[in-house]
C-alpha cells in the first residue's frame, strides 16, 4: 500500500509520536521512510552573513541532525530511513520533498503553535494537509 512515507521531525513530542506511527506503518507495509528536518531560517534572510549568523545556522543544522538521529534510535526493525535536512519554510519544504520523492503518505505531528502565532501564520500541519498531493496523517 505505502512505498514511501515522509516524516517531518522537529524534535517535539508530537513529532516523536508521529515517528512511532510512521515506523509501525512502514514495518507492516514494507515502506521506506524519508525523514526530513527543516531549519527555518527566515529570521536571518537578508542579514549579512557574519560569524554570529553563521554559528546560529550551524547550531540549527546540528539540532536537525540530532533530531534525525533520535528518530533512528526508535527504529527497532529494518525499516530503511533516509535523512534529509533542508533550510526554508517548513510547510513549503515538506511539500517539495513529498513531490520530489513521490511520497505516498506524510505522517507528521500536529503543530505546536498556539494563540496569536497560529492565527497569523497557520500551522505547518494545516498547510501541508491543505496542499499535499498525497495522504497526510496528523498525529496529536
Label each residue range with its predicted role.
Residues 53-66:
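A short acidic, glycine-rich active-site loop
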Residues 73-106:
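Structural beta-alpha unit
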Residues 3-52:
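Small/aliphatic-rich secondary-structure junction motif
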Residues 18, 64-67, 124:
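Hydrophobic alpha-helical membrane-association signature
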Residues 1-17, 77, 82, 131-140:
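Intrinsically disordered or low-complexity boundary/linker segments at protein termini
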Residues 1, 29-32, 79-80, 102:
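Short loop/turn motifs at secondary-structure junctions
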Residues 63, 85-89, 111:
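Short beta->alpha linker loops
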Residues 96-140:
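Gly/Ser-rich helix-loop-strand patches that form or flank binding pockets
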Amino acid at each position: 500500500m505505502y512505498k514511501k512515507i515522509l516524516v517531518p521531525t522537529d524534535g517535539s513530542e508530537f513529532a516523536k509520536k508521529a515517528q512511532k506511527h510512521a515506523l509501525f506503518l512502514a514495518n507492516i507495509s514494507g515502506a521506506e521512510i524519508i525523514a526530513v528536518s527543516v531549519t527555518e531560517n527566515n529570521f536571518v534572510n537578508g542579514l549579512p552573513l557574519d560569524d554570529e549568523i553563521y554559528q546560529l545556522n550551524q547550531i540549527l543544522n546540528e539540532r536537525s541532525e540530532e533530531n534525525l538521529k533520535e528518530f533512528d534510535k526508535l527504529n527497532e526493525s529494518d525499516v530503511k530511513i533516509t535523512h534529509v535536512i533542508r533550510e526554508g519554510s517548513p510547510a513549503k519544504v515538506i511539500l517539495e520533498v513529498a513531490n520530489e520523492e513521490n511520497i505516498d503518505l506524510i505522517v507528521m505531528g500536529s503543530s505546536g503553535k498556539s494563540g496569536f502565532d497560529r492565527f497569523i501564520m497557520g500551522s505547518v500541519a494545516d498547510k501541508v494537509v491543505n496542499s499535499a498531493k498525497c495522504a497526510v496523517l496528523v498525529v496529536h
